[in-house]
């Protein structure tokens, strides 16, 4: 069994996927727009992302533009990235922080040589944890 996060974006999924390609080296394995699906797309969603799948390291993350009504609910989550060393932690944290908000600066903790939390410019919360 695997847990695969699915991220819903407010009409900026394509931009987010491209950002993760640059910031995290994400490898896109699939990207389909609503206009390419078998059914007629919701009005105004033709060029938005119906489904994207990309790899970050060995993990698969999926995403799309949310065409459903805006709902509020559970928001208590972060994506945690385990990185090999402090240099990778600094690079990854810095890349995700561009246009985002640092929630906890990258620093030494009792459990990690470098740990930090950042909300990227799309509002996705990330925890960067150095494992060595």
Spell out what each predicted region is.
Residues 3, 29-30, 50-55, 63-72, ...:
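Vicinal oxygen chelate
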